[in-house]
Amino acid sequence: MVPEMSERQEFQASEFAYLLENSSYDYGENETYFCCTSPPCPQDFSLNFDRTFLPVLYSLLFVLGLLGNGVVAVVLLSQRAALSSTDTFLLHLAVADALLVLTLPLWAVDAAIQWVFGSGLCKVAGALFNINFYAGALLLACISFDRYLSIVHATQFYRRGPPARVALTCVAVWGLCLLFALPDFIFLSSHHDNRLNATHCQYNFPQEGRTALRVLQLVAGFLLPLLVMAYCYARILTVLLVSRGQRRLRAMRLVVVVVVAFALCWTPYHLVVLVDTLMDLGALARNCGRESRVDVAKSVTSGMGYMHCCLNPLLYAFVGVKFRERMWVLLMRLGCPDQRGHQRQPSASRRDSSWSETTEASYSGL
């Protein structure tokens, strides 16, 4: 997926071309005019909405996402010798989210004015966006599976295996995401729309390719990771519910938030895209009012999905006690005074324990 502005413009252009190709004229005695298709719907409302809404939203998400994920990466790297498997996945997740939001200023310019960066950067920006879109979802699934093995089966899959096992898993995730992004390198290009008198970064393939790409995004970028997370955390909750102690109750609340946040951020977008795809395929009737509402809904719900990049630092790092302790240590190294007062500081051995031993997560809070 790339931000929805380009995809909508591409469909409008193809719709206009189809209209020209399928028009017929009858200059008979009465000089009548006949056209077999309806004219394209006016898009003034949705385009004006995008020009106002998307640049503001993308700019805000760029600042918050880069700052939050940057802090997570710095804190994790400051203690990289003591990183657990979950912490390593979180580091890669922070990098993926940061790289995704790095492309948002380009899409903000595309929405506000037009694409002014050429076809080369169009391909790179689109591929970078999609690589990190898929990586974010798949890394969350890896974290869920790691926690599931550790808590439900008391198996330290990565800790007791070869040291490179977690690194190889991350390499496999990035390689798979690069494979998923190949259509961006091949089919994305800057295209001038004569009807709109503007250039946009968009896909150049037929409707069948557009539908296939959307199915890939839905299955690989949402449904499969969500199913893995839901199953793993449902089993984790089953184990935690039969345990006692406030620490385990806090962990139970956190694992619920993990699945709920991912689902709430991305489900609306994929439902809207499903409706739009059904309209393209003719399964749902298309009219100008519905098309305009779907266009606006795609812009709003895609923004909700990108917000997940900003939530990840809060959900997977800042709620963890161990993360906050290490962040304070890093700040004190930089010369900041310790503002924690006389709070009790837990021993390092307890904070570094794995879930299978104390059921407390690494400082991700998972």
Curated annotation (Swiss-Prot):
Family matches, as CDD domains: 7tmA_CXCR3
UniProt-annotated location(s): Cell membrane
Positions of the UniProt region annotated as Disordered: 339-366
PTM comment text: Sulfation on Tyr-25 and Tyr-27 is essential for CXCL10 binding.
Keywords associated with the record: Angiogenesis, Cell membrane, Chemotaxis, Disulfide bond, G-protein coupled receptor, Glycoprotein, Membrane, Receptor, Sulfation, Transducer, Transmembrane, Transmembrane helix
Main location: membrane
Annotated glycan sites: 22, 30, 197
GO MF term set: C-C chemokine binding; C-C chemokine receptor activity; C-X-C chemokine binding; C-X-C chemokine receptor activity; signaling receptor activity
Topology term for the membrane: Multi-pass membrane protein
Annotated positions of the Sulfotyrosine modification: 25, 27
Known role: Receptor for the C-X-C chemokine CXCL9, CXCL10 and CXCL11 and mediates the proliferation, survival and angiogenic activity of mesangial cells through a heterotrimeric G-protein signaling pathway. Probably promotes cell chemotaxis response. Binds to CCL21. Upon activation by PF4, induces activated T-lymphocytes migration mediated via downstream Ras/extracellular signal-regulated kinase (ERK) signaling.
Annotated protein name in UniProt: C-X-C chemokine receptor type 3
